[in-house]
Amino acid sequence: MKKDALILVRGGGDLATGTVHRLWSAGLRVLVLEAEHPAAIRRQVSLCEAVYEGETAVEGLRAVRIETLAQAEEVWKQNAVPVLVDPQGKSIAPAKPDVLVDAILAKKNLGTTRDMAPLTIALGPGFTAGQDVDVVVETKRGHRLGRIIREGSAIPDTGIPGIIGGYGKERVIHAGTAGIFMDLRKIGDIVEAGETIAQIRTADGAMISVTTQITGILRGLLRSSYPVTPGFKVADIDPRKEELSNCFLISDKARCIAGSVLELVCTQLWK
């Protein structure tokens, strides 16, 4: 295996974090590129929180925000993962990654190309394997989750969340209007159906309530003071009230996807 191989991951949300954690656990060097204002809701298991906090930790993995590519080496020496704000990917060429993983999960390609690394991998729909990237990994819950796709694309986004505890679309909450999101509860709280968990302050100063449809644990919640538009995802409820620890653990879905990415990375590096 190539010594000091570099895996560059675009995105630091919860699914991306699952992949980064698996690669880091395997002893690989990983660099995360993120947006200036990440909008993850599963913030307790998202390395992108380092953008706001300076550093964060998920299941023993410490992530540290850096301001320049040159600072990455010092973070790696600390057995941590550097996070660089670089939504345009300007640092990709100078970083010369051995593998690039697009884990932005934007449901469309925001600029990743096959020539960015010897192996390019994309998670989820919006990419065609063999054209936009070398390989695509399926992200839709179900029998095909984690499947490695070398020709074609992942299943298109349906806009309907996967079923957890018997609930699908009811467990995900979206903004009903534009404004500034203000939380009233925190991740890990048990909430009841119909409860107000946040408010949105509109341009005219009105406060619009954000309510839940089901009872459960508040597994994900958008960072307070974040600007939202109608339909913007702001919260995620887990109906399994006994599963509080899930708020702070990488999900089964993220780990399944991560396993496929690790398989691809190892195959590439052992060539």
Feature annotation, model-predicted:
Residues 1-271:
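Well-ordered secondary-structure scaffolds
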